[in-house]
UniProtKB/Swiss-Prot annotation:
Keywords annotated in UniProt: ATP-binding, Chaperone, Nucleotide-binding, Phosphoprotein, Stress response
Gene Ontology MF term list: ATP binding; ATP-dependent protein folding chaperone; unfolded protein binding
Induction text: By stress conditions e.g. heat shock.
Gene assigned in the entry: dnaK
Family the UniProt entry places it in: Belongs to the heat shock protein 70 family.
PANTHER family the UniProt entry points to: HEAT SHOCK PROTEIN 70KDA
Species this protein is from: Burkholderia cenocepacia (strain ATCC BAA-245 / DSM 16553 / LMG 16656 / NCTC 13227 / J2315 / CF5610) (Burkholderia cepacia (strain J2315))
List of residues that carry Phosphothreonine: T200
Entry-linked InterPro entries: ATPase_NBD, Chaperone_DnaK, Heat_shock_70_CS, HSP70_C_sf, HSP70_peptide-bd_sf, Hsp_70_fam
Protein name: Chaperone protein DnaK
SUPFAM superfamilies recorded: Actin-like ATPase domain, Heat shock protein 70kD (HSP70), C-terminal subdomain, Heat shock protein 70kD (HSP70), peptide-binding domain
């Protein structure tokens, strides 16, 4: 059985790790980096770029370069968070036929799981290159506050990438695993994981207990905001730059997608620089042009200005911390350690706010970019049976329930319940002789069902006629270890049953996923064909070069007919190499043809080289003989025998 890899599928960056024995290994990608930008570019020639190569060309291809797609995964187009992003992203966010938020590149509609699968495929390939064997299983992390649709969509992305997702685990929990197993401290302790990433924010309160030599990680509570992260911090800087430029130059850059892409890069860079410096300069020459000529952007930003721009965003992370502490039934003073995860936590203002709330300095010995992937790899080792000393008890982040009479949300499983869990409850009909009931499943904390997220609905039909309130319908909620919900309804009188895994009226159907898997496999086959074609072209180019060189040196030793045949075959190969539509077979045929007619030329070269070597060997032998004769007397005087051996070369 192959290794189960751990993947942190991030909004901004992704990371892959594996366990080697009890040592964790974060794997470098083909560019030599330990994290890969979660950026996917669709090129004109159907090539798909992932990671750093996609990021490098984003300025010139903004409409077809997709980033922060994780913010859309498992979301409906109408959601206010999606609507907010439509105005900010240089690429198109569109409404799919099922009402989900999809994206568009080169006129092709793409589901977010399909796009995220490209990043997962890159992570899979990174691990395979390192291990030298195929990888088929993975543990993938998600924000703790992801709802059922978002978890299901992440699992779908794994399938499309050719991975069997053994477990979906929460990012803060994964970071706690990485932290807990790295420390030698014994005894029970409570930790807070504050995870502010590129697109999402989570906070989890976790108890690490030592139970008979086994490390038990129990999540006491979790809270967060799945639409708050580093991307929002970047956007504040972008908006500020646009405003300042408009004041100075009278030009609105927000309508210029090329300029926006350059601004995004500059904003991210400025934000990072201001984590260590007090001031930075944004310098973008030729950012745009008007009738008076080109315009250049030059702007200084201080750390104080940045902090003022994002103050409310940092403040927004504190309320979820307060709720998580309350839900866990602990006091702030009970927290032994605070762990920071996610690149945005490097901002001094964020660290300061966290210290202010928790009353202690956050730990600095956890790598905020890699801890989540490390934790996922540890969980992979646990699931493969190679590690027995770790037990993970996670929770469901949001309450789950059904809509009952009057549009009320009746909770079946409360938030922060340890998973896996199962709950059954008996309901009845609202009308006399009601033959069917529709079960609508919701996730959220609002009292009325309409204020929560509708996960899906299904019907239980064939209920025998009876007065209202008489039929006994048992509804069962079952949450698996991935945090994914399975619901069943059963008429206790007839035994009729209807079960669903929540797919909602959104999400991808099995047929769509299968098609995407086929497309991905076809792309892999196409990539292989393109690589083989490139190899043939390279072989052809090399043969053209070597044949031309040989003709220059030895062409005069050939008969006129032989030389003409070679020149004709050479031209034929050059023509086919110039033809961009030529396939591998056509190139290979011309390479073979030139190889055959060049045989005589090769023989002439070989014979010439042999003659040269024989001549050189003969001259060397004669020189050695003369030296031997002339030095004989001296050798005798010195009483040293010098032996010479001539080596004949074939």
């Amino acid at each position: 059985m192959g290794k189960i890899i751990g993947i942190d599928l991030g909004t901004t960056n992704s990371c892959v790790a594996i366990m080697e024995g009890n040592q964790v290994k974060v794997i470098e990608n083909s560019e030599g980096a330990r994290t890969t930008p979660s950026i996917i570019a669709y090129m004109d020639d159907n090539e798909v770029l992932v990671g750093a190569p996609a990021k490098r060309q984003s300025v010139t291809n903004p409409k077809n370069t997709l980033f922060a797609v994780k913010r859309l995964i498992g979301r409906r187009f109408e959601e206010k968070e999606v609507q907010k992003d439509i105005g900010l992203m240089p690429y198109s966010i569109i409404k799919a036929d099922n009402g989900d938020a999809w994206v568009e590149a080169h006129g092709e509609k793409l589901a977010p799981p399909q796009v995220s699968a490209e990043v997962l495929r890159k992570m899979k390939k990174t691990a395979e290159d390192y291990l030298g064997e195929p990888v088929t299983e993975a543990v993938i992390t998600v924000p703790a506050y992801f709802n059922d649709s978002q978890r299901q969509a992440t699992k779908d992305a794994g399938r499309i990438a050719g991975l069997e997702v053994k477990r979906i685990i929460n990012e803060p929990t994964a970071a706690a695993l990485a932290f807990g197993l790295d420390k030698a401290e014994k005894g029970d302790r409570k930790i807070a994981v504050y995870d502010l990433g590129g697109g999402t924010f989570d906070v989890s309160i976790i108890e690490i207990a030592d139970v008979d030599g086994e490390m038990q990680f129990e999540v006491l509570s979790t809270n967060g905001d799945t639409f708050l992260g580093g991307e929002d911090f970047d956007q504040r800087i972008i908006d500020y730059i646009i405003g300042e430029f408009k004041k100075e130059q009278g030009v609105d850059l927000s309508k210029d997608v090329l300029a926006l892409q350059r601004l995004k890069e500059a904003a991210e860079k400025a934000k990072i620089e201001l984590s260590s410096g007090q001031q930075t300069e944004i310098n973008l020459p030729y950012i745009t042009a008007d009738a008076s000529g080109p315009k250049h952007l030059n702007l200084k930003i201080t750390r104080a200005k940045l902090e003022a721009l994002v103050e409310d965003l940092v403040e927004r992370t504190i309320e979820p911390c307060r709720i998580a502490i309350k839900d866990a039934g602990v006091k702030v003073s009970d927290i032994d350690d605070v762990i920071l995860v996610g690149g945005q936590t490097r901002m001094p203002k964020v660290m300061e706010k966290v210290k202010e709330f928790f009353g202690k300095d956050p730990r600095r010995d956890v790598n905020p970019d890699e801890a989540v992937a490390v934790g996922a790899a540890i969980q992979g080792q646990v699931l493969s049976g190679d590690r027995k000393d770790v037990l993970l008890l996670d929770v469901t982040p949001l309450s789950l329930g059904i809509e009952t009479l009057g549009g009320v949300m009746t909770k079946m499983i409360n938030k922060n319940t340890t998973i896996p869990t199962k709950h059954a409850q008996v309901y009845s009909t609202a009308d006399d002789n009601q033959g069917a009931v529709t079960i609508k499943v919701f996730q959220g904390e609002r009292e009325m069902a309409a204020g929560n997220k509708l996960l899906g609905e299904f019907n239980l039909e064939g209920i025998p006629p009876a007065p209202r309130g008489v039929p006994q319908i048992e509804v069962t909620f079952d949450i698996d270890a991935n945090g994914i919900l399975h619901v069943g309804a059963k008429d206790k009188a007839t035994g009729k049953e209807n079960k669903i895994t929540i797919k909602a009226n959104s999400g991808l159907s099995e047929a769509e996923i299968d098609q995407m898997i086929k497309d991905a496999e076809a792309n892999a086959a196409e990539d292989h064909k393109l690589r083989e074609l490139a190899d043939s072209r390279n072989q052809g180019d090399a043969l053209v070069h070597s044949t031309k060189k040989a003709l220059t040196e030895y062409g005069d030793k050939l008969d006129a007919g032989e030389k003409e045949a070679i020149e004709a075959a050479l031209k034929s190969l050059e023509d086919v190499l110039k033809d961009t539509s030529a396939d591998k077979a056509a190139i290979d045929a011309k390479v073979e043809e030139l190889g055959k007619v060049s045989q005589k030329l090769g023989e002439k070269m070989y014979a010439d080289m042999q003659a040269q070597q024989a001549g050189a060997a003969g001259a060397a032998g004669a020189a050695e003989g003369a030296a031997h004769a002339g030095g004989a007397q001296q050798a005798a005087d010195d009483v040293v025998d010098a032996e010479f051996k001539e080596v004949k070369k074939d």
